[in-house]
């Protein structure tokens, strides 16, 4: 907890999934790089990935009750007011204990109570804490839409996400904050080490496959189903199938390996080992894959409101990847479309260059500077 008011105190709220947590932690790192005396505290829930990711990155984590916002009318709507009150109450305790100067929200289960708790409360008995909102997705969620109405600054990855500050037609477009270990990655320099780490051959094309932190059955089935074709074409595979899934791919005698793992904890090495990737198109995934300049086959999650396809469109429009519908991804597609790409170094190089050009490598630092500026303006008026 922060009792020294000469020290900047920042609350980052973005728990639940890696897509909310990683941008928050990237901004936290960037704030510390600018002001190493700053205290950054993360809000999260007991059931989110933040219980692992936040401590690993060295930041204090304060848990609050989650507030899932149903997209459609369900019985959960009846429970929502009570959940919100409990979560806001707990969040206010954290804001007071840390002496928070600014709240930075990235959407997710903890963002809404953070936005509400930062307000002055009934009869304006509390100090108002300024809010900065960052929307990573191409279509904003409910929490960030509510937060944007109260925010000092509203930032977004792409135009037209549906959030903006008062008096503006759109958010400030900065891209998605990505950790420095990814934006500064030199894939070619790490290639030999990365391939040795995973037991992949030093030469020849490598296909990276992952479906998010929990894997993706359709990606698993399509790529493993093309294992013989991939091996025959001399393509090695690094495939993260998800901790709840299994993948048994017989080794091809004399052929390149098909390395199947539940989870990839060293994404920097995975990206460095690969020549192309098949993956979902969550906002954070698209940001990282484009930042490192990897050609990608994006397979949007076939649920929700089509946000994942929207996330991938800018990179695809720039020529850095392609989109294939989940239902169209098959072993045949891998054999007929992905293998020829992996066997074409010139096309891989061109797509990689275009992907890198579509990314925003400085987003974390830019967001951090805005957060510090917003906090300074408020601190100066106290």
Curated annotation (Swiss-Prot):
Major subcellular site: membrane
Q: What NCBIfam families does its record include?
A: murG
Q: Per its UniProt record, what PANTHER family does this chain match?
A: GLYCOSYLTRANSFERASE, UDP-N-ACETYLGLUCOSAMINE--N-ACETYLMURAMYL-(PENTAPEPTIDE) PYROPHOSPHORYL-UNDECAPRENOL N-ACETYLGLUCOSAMINE TRANSFERASE 1
Q: Where in the cell is it found?
A: Cell membrane
Enumerate the GO terms in the molecular function aspect. UDP-N-acetyl-D-glucosamine:N-acetylmuramoyl-L-alanyl-D-glutamyl-meso-2,6-diaminopimelyl-D-alanyl-D-alanine-diphosphoundecaprenol 4-beta-N-acetylglucosaminlytransferase activity; undecaprenyldiphospho-muramoylpentapeptide beta-N-acetylglucosaminyltransferase activity
- Family listed: Belongs to the glycosyltransferase 28 family. MurG subfamily.
Q: Name one Pfam family in it.
A: Glyco_tran_28_C
Q: Kindly list the biological process annotations in GO that this record carries.
A: carbohydrate metabolic process; cell division; cell wall organization; lipid glycosylation; peptidoglycan biosynthetic process; regulation of cell shape
Disulfide-bonded cysteine pairs: these are: none
Organism of derivation: Rhodococcus opacus (strain B4)
Name of the protein described by the UniProt record: UDP-N-acetylglucosamine--N-acetylmuramyl-(pentapeptide) pyrophosphoryl-undecaprenol N-acetylglucosamine transferase
Q: What does this protein do?
A: Cell wall formation. Catalyzes the transfer of a GlcNAc subunit on undecaprenyl-pyrophosphoryl-MurNAc-pentapeptide (lipid intermediate I) to form undecaprenyl-pyrophosphoryl-MurNAc-(pentapeptide)GlcNAc (lipid intermediate II).
Question: How does the protein's chain sit in the membrane according to the entry?
Answer: Peripheral membrane protein
Q: Could you tell me the keywords of this UniProt record?
A: Cell cycle, Cell division, Cell membrane, Cell shape, Cell wall biogenesis/degradation, Glycosyltransferase, Membrane, Peptidoglycan synthesis, Transferase
This enzyme catalyses:
di-trans,octa-cis-undecaprenyl diphospho-N-acetyl-alpha-D-muramoyl-L-alanyl-D-glutamyl-meso-2,6-diaminopimeloyl-D-alanyl-D-alanine + UDP-N-acetyl-alpha-D-glucosamine = di-trans,octa-cis-undecaprenyl diphospho-[N-acetyl-alpha-D-glucosaminyl-(1->4)]-N-acetyl-alpha-D-muramoyl-L-alanyl-D-glutamyl-meso-2,6-diaminopimeloyl-D-alanyl-D-alanine + UDP + H(+)
Matching SUPFAM superfamilies:
UDP-Glycosyltransferase/glycogen phosphorylase (SSF53756)
The organism's taxonomy opens as: Bacteria, Bacillati, Actinomycetota, Actinomycetes, Mycobacteriales
């Amino acid at each position: 907890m922060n009792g020294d008011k000469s020290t900047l105190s920042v609350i980052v709220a973005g728990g639940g999934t890696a897509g909310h947590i990683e941008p928050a932690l990237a901004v936290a790192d960037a704030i510390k790089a600018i002001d190493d005396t700053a205290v950054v505290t993360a809000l999260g829930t007991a059931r989110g990935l933040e219980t692992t990711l936040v401590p690993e990155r060295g930041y204090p984590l304060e848990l609050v009750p989650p507030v899932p916002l149903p997209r459609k009318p369900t019985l959960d709507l009846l429970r929502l007011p009570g959940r919100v009150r409990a979560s806001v109450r707990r969040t206010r305790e954290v804001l007071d204990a840390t002496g928070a100067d600014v709240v930075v929200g990235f959407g997710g289960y903890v963002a809404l109570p953070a936005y509400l708790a930062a307000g002055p409360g009934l009869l304006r008995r509390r100090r108002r804490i300024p809010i900065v909102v960052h929307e990573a997705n191409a279509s904003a969620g409910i929490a960030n839409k509510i937060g944007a109405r109260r925010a000092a600054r509203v930032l977004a990855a792409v135009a037209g996400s549906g959030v903006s500050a008062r008096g503006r037609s759109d958010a400030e477009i900065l891209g998605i904050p990505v950790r420095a270990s990814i934006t500064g990655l030199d894939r070619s320099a790490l290639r030999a080490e990365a391939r040795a780490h995973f037991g992949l051959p030093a030469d020849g094309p490598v296909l990276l496959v992952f479906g998010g932190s929990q894997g993706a059955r359709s990606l698993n089935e399509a790529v493993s189903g093309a294992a013989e074709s991939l091996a025959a074409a001399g393509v090695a595979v690094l495939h993260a199938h998800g901790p709840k899934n299994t993948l048994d791919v017989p080794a091809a005698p004399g052929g390149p390996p098909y390395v199947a793992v539940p989870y990839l904890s060293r994404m920097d090495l995975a990206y460095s080992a690969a020549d192309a990737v098949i993956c979902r198109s969550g906002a954070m995934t698209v940001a990282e894959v484009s930042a490192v300049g990897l050609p990608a086959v994006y397979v949007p999650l076939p649920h929700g409101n089509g946000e994942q396809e929207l996330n991938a469109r800018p990179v695809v429009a720039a020529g850095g990847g392609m989109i294939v519908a989940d239902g169209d991804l098959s072993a045949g597609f891998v054999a007929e479309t992905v293998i020829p790409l992996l066997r074409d170094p010139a096309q891989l190089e061109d797509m990689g260059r275009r992907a890198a050009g579509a990314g925003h490598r400085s987003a974390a630092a830019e967001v951090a500077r805005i957060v510090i500026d917003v906090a300074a303006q408020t601190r100066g008026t106290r």
